[in-house]
């Protein structure tokens, strides 16, 4: 199962980083849609069990993750019209990072990630394609390098892989979606 789309930035009112302090499970995304009024929702970056973000993460001006390094990630303002890949941390109202795969139209030769992010697993990614907001959520197991190659071949200008494996999830207003681990 796979969910993927691109949207012109002019059609997007908001891209929200939802801080899941209520600990909704991957199978409860409909609750997040109801709470936020969003059109669709999917998983994000890596979090520890105590809800601490492992990677650079900022939502509505609140920094949730600030590791001591710089890296490429997706950043945007309150209305998402400036949604683009930026060098993080940066001054944008919102940003997210996990594993950069495509930067300025070029696939990264050696994406940087820890061993637990490797291997073949379901994956999710965000980025841009032809100046549009792009996302992919797939149950197809890919290594980070295979996902990079798939996104680059599809013409993505920028891509950041988010958390994968059992954290891969998607739900839209029509009820379409997936949550990989109902027991989580």
Short names for language-model regions:
Residues 1-184:
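Gly/Ser/Thr/Pro-rich low-complexity, intrinsically disordered segments
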């Amino acid at each position: 199962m796979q969910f993927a789309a691109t949207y012109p930035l002019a059609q997007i009112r908001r891209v929200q980083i939802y801080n899941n302090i209520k600990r909704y499970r991957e199978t409860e995304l409909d609750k997040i849609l109801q709470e936020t009024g969003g059109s669709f929702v999917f998983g994000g970056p890596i979090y520890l069990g105590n809800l601490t973000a492992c990677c650079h993460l900022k939502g509505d001006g609140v920094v949730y993750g600030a590791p001591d390094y710089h890296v490429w990630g997706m950043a945007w303002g309150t209305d998402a019209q400036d949604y683009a890949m930026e060098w993080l941390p940066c001054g944008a109202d919102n940003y997210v990072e996990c594993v950069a795969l495509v930067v300025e139209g070029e696939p990264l030769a050696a994406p940087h990630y820890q061993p637990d992010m490797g291997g073949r697993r379901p994956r999710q990614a965000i980025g841009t394609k032809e100046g549009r907001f792009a996302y992919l959520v797939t149950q197809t197991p890919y290594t980070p390098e295979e996902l990079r190659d798939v996104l680059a071949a599809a013409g993505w200008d920028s891509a950041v892989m988010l958390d994968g494996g059992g954290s891969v999830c998607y739900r839209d207003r029509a009820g379409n979606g997936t949550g990989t681990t109902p027991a989580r």
